[in-house]
Amino acid sequence: MAFHKFKIGQRVTYRLTTTPAVYTVTALLPERAGEFKYHIRRSGASIDLVVGESELREAKNR
């Protein structure tokens, strides 16, 4: 059985953006096309992005 790599509330970086930014995982979504999906939100934003697990990296603590 496979599990999500990231957890709700975890800080991640989204690697497909041109500007480096830290996002927070807001929801875990089911697997689609062989990959887990997530809702992520940037601080101060009002909408979530839906992204695949391969597009995320764990954010470094500052």
Q: Language model features by range: what are they?
A:
Residues 31-33, 48:
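Short glycine/serine/proline-enriched coil/turn segments at secondary-structure junctions
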Residues 15, 28-30, 43:
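Residue-level recognition of beta-strand microenvironments
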Residues 41-62:
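Intrinsically disordered, low-complexity, charged/polar segments
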